[in-house]
A protein has these predicted regions:
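Bacterial N-terminal signal peptides
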Residues: 2-13
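Extracellular carbohydrate-recognition regions
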Residues: 18-43
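Extracellular beta-strand elements of beta-rich domains used
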Residues: 28, 194, 212-216
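Short carbohydrate-recognition loop motifs
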Residues: 50-71
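Extracellular/lumenal carbohydrate-interaction signature centered on repeated Trp-anchored short motifs
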Residues: 75-86, 163-166
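Solvent-exposed strand-to-loop "edge" motifs in beta-rich extracellular domains
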Residues: 89-95, 118, 177-179
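Extracellular beta-strand ligand-recognition surfaces/modules
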Residues: 108-113, 151-162, 166-205
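Extracellular/luminal beta-rich ligand-recognition
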Residues: 108-153
Length: 218
């Protein structure tokens, strides 16, 4: 689940977001080679399957996985003192079979939103907001650092779980600053990166999700 986070440090250009009012931080508009403008594609396993499509009221980013793992990443500079809330819209239409982030062998999700606070060599911190197939809503856990990335400090929050809301557009709101304080026992400064990820390689199954805007608000 966490491998793709490390690539954020290589992306060029930082998008600074400083505003007193509500700001649409990250949207999805056509770019090169099918990747939305301003984002960078990172492939972990298999072939990526993504497209910008018309869905309901407007454009959406569609991600599909077939025993694959890939992410879209973007560097930003977001002041959490001014805009501590993240608001996003997502829809899951297919969940990886038996997916459960609590076990390495089944750690697959159709929709994952990462906010990255630091990717310095010796200090990598992030929170992942996920839609899990099995783990109950509200579950939180710190993911053990893999041997290749001993300085990664990743916490997971299950925002949605299972089939009950499948096929529905849902708007989520999280107080990122508050979540950080609870999970890291410290005060956050800013967000340096955002990542959307989908994977199903562990369960060798399939997953599909749709995304609209991601905003940070007062």
């Amino acid at each position: 689940m966490a491998v793709g986070l490390l690539v954020l440090g290589t992306l060029g250009g930082v998008v600074a977001i400083w505003a007193a009012e509500r700001v649409q931080v990250l949207g999805f508009v056509p770019g090169k080679n099918g990747v939305p403008d301003g984002w960078e594609l990172f492939v972990n396993v298999g072939e990526p399957d993504l497209a910008l499509v018309q869905d309901g009221e407007g454009r959406a980013l569609k991600l599909r996985t077939r025993a694959s793992s890939f992410s879209l990443q973007r560097k930003v500079a977001i002041d959490l003192k001014r805009t501590p809330f993240v608001v996003w819209q997502w829809k899951v239409t297919e969940l990886p079979q038996r997916g459960d982030f609590r076990h390495r062998a089944t750690d697959d999700q159709a929709a994952q939103l990462y906010v990255v606070f630091s990717w310095e060599v010796f200090r990598k911190e992030a929170i992942a907001y996920i839609w899990d197939s099995t783990a109950p809503e509200g579950t939180t856990a710190r993911i053990p650092s893999p041997a290749l990335y001993p300085f990664l400090n990743l916490h997971v929050i299950v925002v949605r779980s299972g089939e009950a809301e499948r096929g529905k557009w849902i708007t989520e709101t999280r107080n990122v600053a508050e979540d950080y304080r609870k999970l890291f026992a410290a005060n956050p400064d800013k967000i340096q990166g955002v990542m959307i990820q989908i994977n199903s390689q562990h369960t060798e199954s399939r997953g599909e999700s749709y995304w609209r805007s991601i905003r940070f608000t007062p």
